[in-house]
A protein has these predicted regions:
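ATP-dependent carboxylate-amine ligase catalytic core
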Residues: 2-14, 23-108, 116-142, 152-154
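Internal gly/pro-rich beta-alpha loop/helix module
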Residues: 123-229
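Phosphate-binding active sites in nucleotide-utilizing proteins
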Residues: 229-300
Length: 426
């Protein structure tokens, strides 16, 4: 079994495109690959869907044991684990290394491959690399990949090697990686028509895959955990999943499988499922029309079926959704109006405590908030949570109505208890 972390010295080094290319190339060797993504982001994990949707590893939301448990579970039966980092290697929570890529690498005791954009850089690249190595000597930085390199950087590679450092790739500027990078952060993986074979061939030509596999063999005992994703219980859990609704942590879905049977459906295709409870994740509902789903989910909510919704899912349940161009009626389950802006309204981790009884959670939680909209709730709106983020109303989040709970917070279920008693409530 092999596993390694691919990190950048900062955002924008090309680590995501290179990680995707390496994943494609290793898959082509008939090895079973499991991709992971450090941090709470939903978009980057989707770009590995040609292999498997990447699993988020986040020590703030999951704690260290949760990171180990998740990694072990998803690596069961796999040959290679590829963990794409977030931001720069040491960039973590509130100017610390906590929850950073380096923190995840140390929790799992994995080697790090550092991606450096060496365009317009020569020996300074060596100074940067040695600075990163010396910043935390307890971290195993196994080597480097030069990105946006020229023929000159073959000479720089020799300088690195004379110092005893591994250079796993001298990657030139290329149309295929540029095309890949244009999609990142803008489109979901399911919307991208990528040439996986071309990416694999590019990686085989410019990256020392054998060398990376050589330094990334793992033997840690905690990886040997039984994988059990069998669906248990008779509770039917309806989950909309398509281009409008796709922001779900894979571990959250796995938790739900332990209390019921997941029923996925596409509102954009007019699909619907008759279930006992509904979980509406985030995504881009503002970009699409789904009038039949609005009517359907309103009826289910008003019939007191439990409905849990996050961010974009909460917007669907609101009274209206307004942007500069339009004002749309939504399901009207919640007495809330949503206003979209061009300015980011909230970004960051959140901690939440329970302040009112609700159908889904009875303990505090950790999660993430990221949205360009704000909510205008009626003055008598009741809330289930108080958070240290923005939430719906100055930190109050988790709007309550009927048997519905909806808020801006994306909650990781490893940080709380998604009520197993729900089976007795429906």
């Amino acid at each position: 079994m092999h596993a390694f972390v691919i990190s950048g010295i900062q955002s924008g080094t090309g680590k995501t495109s290179i990680s995707i290319a390496i994943t494609a190339a290793i898959m082509r060797r008939n090895l079973k690959v499991q991709p992971f993504k450090v941090g709470p982001d939903f978009i980057d994990p989707s770009h590995y869907s040609f292999c498997e949707w990447a699993v988020n590893l986040d020590s703030f939301m999951m704690d260290e044991d949760g990171v180990r448990r998740s990694f072990s579970k998803w690596m069961n039966g796999k040959d290679v684990g590829i963990i794409e980092g977030v931001m720069g290697l040491f960039d973590g929570y509130r100017l610390s290394t906590f929850s950073s890529t380096s923190h995840i690498a140390k929790i799992l005791n994995l080697p790090v491959i550092l991606v450096m954009d060496v365009k317009a850089m020569s020996l300074s690249a060596l100074a940067l690399f040695e600075g990163f190595r010396n910043f935390d000597r307890g971290l195993n930085i196994a080597g480097v990949i030069f990105n946006n390199a020229t023929r000159f950087h073959q000479k720089l590679k020799r300088v690195f090697e004379e110092r005893g450092y591994r250079v796993f790739g001298v990657v030139p500027k290329s149309e295929i990686l540029e095309m890949e990078s244009r999609h990142l952060g803008l489109h979901l993986g399911m919307e991208v028509d990528r040439d996986v074979n071309a990416l694999a061939e590019f990686a085989e030509e410019h990256i020392d895959l054998d060398g990376i596999l050589e330094v990334s063999e793992i033997h840690n005992e905690f990886y040997k955990v039984e994988k059990d994703f069998e669906e248990n219980g008779n509770l039917r859990i309806g989950i909309p999943f398509d281009q409008a609704f796709s922001f779900y942590y894979r571990d959250n879905l796995d938790v739900l499988k332990k209390i019921g049977r997941l029923e996925f459906f596409s509102p954009l295709k007019g699909e619907r499922v008759d279930c006992d409870v509904y979980y509406i994740g985030g995504g881009y509902p503002e970009l699409y029309e789904f009038p039949d789903f609005l009517k359907f989910i309103k009826k289910e909510a008003l019939d007191e079926k439990p409905v849990y919704a996050e961010c974009g899912g909460m917007m669907v349940l609101a009274r209206s959704l307004e942007s500069e161009e339009t004002r749309r009626k939504m399901a009207g389950v919640l007495d809330i109006d949503i206003v979209f802006t061009k300015k980011l309204q909230a970004l960051g981790y959140v901690k939440g405590e329970i302040i009112n009884e609700n159908p889904f959670f009875d303990t505090g939680f950790r999660g993430h908030e990221f949205h360009y909209s704000y909510a205008i709730p009626d003055s008598d709106m009741r809330f289930a949570f108080r958070t240290d983020g923005r939430g719906i109303d100055n930190g109050l989040d988790g709007a309550l109505a009927y048997n519905t709970l909806a808020g801006y917070s994306h909650i990781h279920f490893y940080s709380t208890k998604f009520l197993p008693e729900l089976r007795e409530k429906v």
